[in-house]
Amino acid sequence: MALLDLAQEGMALFGFVLFVVLWLMHFMSIIYTRLHLNKKATDKQPYSKLPGVSLLKPLKGVDPNLINNLETFFELDYPKYEVLLCVQDHDDPAIDVCKKLLGKYPNVDARLFIGGKKVGINPKINNLMPAYEVAKYDLIWICDSGIRVIPDTLTDMVNQMTEKVGLVHGLPYVADRQGFAATLEQVYFGTSHPRSYISANVTGFKCVTGMSCLMRKDVLDQAGGLIAFAQYIAEDYFMAKAIADRGWRFSMSTQVAMQNSGSYSISQFQSRMIRWTKLRINMLPATIICEPISECFVASLIIGWAAHHVFRWDIMVFFMCHCLAWFIFDYIQLRGVQGGTLCFSKLDYAVAWFIRESMTIYIFLSALWDPTISWRTGRYRLRCGGTAEEILDV
């Protein structure tokens, strides 16, 4: 009986610690968003003396927004940069889009690379290798095909690349688009994701996504170049780790990495979340414990039980009040990341928020159930530590 009492006391203490940690994350991310995001960065050096940048753009297939997204990179207001467009397959329709833009912007230093170079199991690395090998500038900007930018995006990122910084990354967010699936994505990338992403970076944990990353090429070369990361599916995590292990700091751009894919749906979003969770579980096994208890409904139940055990408060009343507070703070976070008026109503937000939170346990259990992922054109079996092997159809 004494052992049971001790276990309950321990669980109650855990609940209160969880409460403090999660609400610190809320406050840190909201304050950081208000102070840092969507602010014009201070110019660290004269415009004419900004260093050259090689943009590596991996492309696969075409969606309705691809040409408009790509065109924003040809219209950057930056003195010295090159655009290296990378397409793996010779019959990919993205090639025609690239050729159209190359013809429209002859004064932009841009080239098209077709065919890639097989150096490992990561298709993105394979696609980028020929461009990486001929990149002529000291700064490498790897940016996904679904990202769109504004003219001063690159200037902002380079201004963050100060003397001791080795990597500049953008907080992933989603552009305003039509439909409930777009709202669902926007709610996730404006609430749950930045809360974890920002608080991790503020407290010194290296949390980086590869959607938009500016890196020092010489530091990557010291780590073995891109080829050293071809054995991983989550190459962005291991590239960031290699840079951090060499003593370099990270900085976050004041502009978000604006995702603007023209192809989106609830099922695509769900599949993406499951894939990301699988990768996190294999790279960081502690995710198995930390991730479920950091979500609203599970956390509210644990903390509610702790409050009931210690103060005899009604669990369900506490659960509802805690979820309501979480819901409100998430809305504040979302408005901060958006940096302006949302394109959907508060009712749309409420529905999308509830559905997203309700999906979390299913997503987590689905990720645990099957260790394989489908990405781009292949299927892969994940191994502990982040490596993977390709599953070949016989």
Curated annotation (Swiss-Prot):
A motif (D3) lies at residue 236. It holds the Pfam family Glyco_transf_21. Keywords: Acetylation, Glycosyltransferase, Golgi apparatus, Lipid biosynthesis, Lipid metabolism, Membrane, Sphingolipid metabolism, Transferase, Transmembrane, Transmembrane helix. This is Ceramide glucosyltransferase. It comes from Mus musculus. Interacts with RTN1; regulates the ceramide glucosyltransferase activity of UGCG. It is an enzyme of class 2 (transferase). It is found in: Golgi apparatus membrane.
